[in-house]
Amino acid sequence: MKPEHTTMRVAMYYKNDDVRIEEKPVPDIGPGEILVQTVACGLCGGETMEWYLASRAPKVLGHEPTGIVVSAGPGVDKFVPGDRVHVHHHAPCMSCHFCHRGRFTLCESFSKSYLDPGGFAEYFRAPADLVRFDTLKLPPNVSFEAGTIIEPMACTLKGIRQTPLHPGDTVAVIGLGFMGMCYLELLTLEPAGKIFALDFSEWRLEKALSLGATHGLNPANEDVQEKLRDLNHGRGADAVFVTAPTLKAWESGLALVERGGQLHLGAPPPPGEIWPVDSNALYFSEVQINSTYSAHHVDTQAVLDLLEAGRVNADALITHRFGLDGVEKAIQLLLGAGDSLKSLIYPSGVPDRPEA
């Protein structure tokens, strides 16, 4: 297989309200690399953070892609043209201090690896380190659409692994966007007892209940701290997972967690924001606070295994589909935080009937 053309269409990001369809050369590949024709790629919430993207723009976004291998460079023996794959956009060096400790996402090489140019393009090049460490063949029963959730759900799986639960623990998830729903799906596989879901959107609260949350709380019309304790024998949550990237959400999480509990921070506020915390109260509460950035090859393989086994439902999380010219609309939809979760981009156009 070879690409039909030497140029391709890409969605070039300049700002949240300025995404342009442009033409770029189809990337050449070298030893150990593969060229992939993008079938579908999810839009990540991080790809709407202008403070994060400003220094990188203009840029082709998209790091949750699935596609078909078009060609493989010399030395590639695990993949052949026609293979259906998901490619993770980061890979560790496997030889540094952090890699030796299993903290792969802290590896200096990790965030320097990338897809060329990105998933919002008709084709992309996967460099050799990505091919070697974190390119996954999709099993026959895992669709291209389902494969797009591997990377983001792997991030939430990593967060749960860093926040181990005891049987019967009461947990709370703050923020019910796509990532919050991923936490919910995975928490239903854990030994948790009550699962509280918190959001300002009634639509998202209803969705959370359908995915396994036992209680939905809306901070807009009730005192969620008092309500959670009323429903939990006077106690706070044993573990709180915060997915909203705001200090207010972090403060809410700390207020909801029980003494001796765990607070997991799953999304970053803008740089420079300082979190004022009562340090004395925090000390005596013995609350453990952790955070997680990205995911690695152990997590992505685990999510693929869950998808193949039918243990998680990708279809329930995908709400919108767009062609390449719909990236800007998808960004605005995500920023609106309305009746949407995951939007997929189809660079070659949305099929009449997405692959089952």
Give the ranges of each region predicted by the language model:
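C-terminal hydrophobic helical "lid"/dimerization subdomain
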Residues: K2-V10, E251-A255, H297-A356
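Glycine-rich beta-strand-centered segment in the early N-terminal region that forms part
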Residues: V26-C41, Y52-H97, P139
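Short strand-turn motif at the edge of the Rossmann-like AdoMet-binding core
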Residues: G266-P270, T292-S294, F322
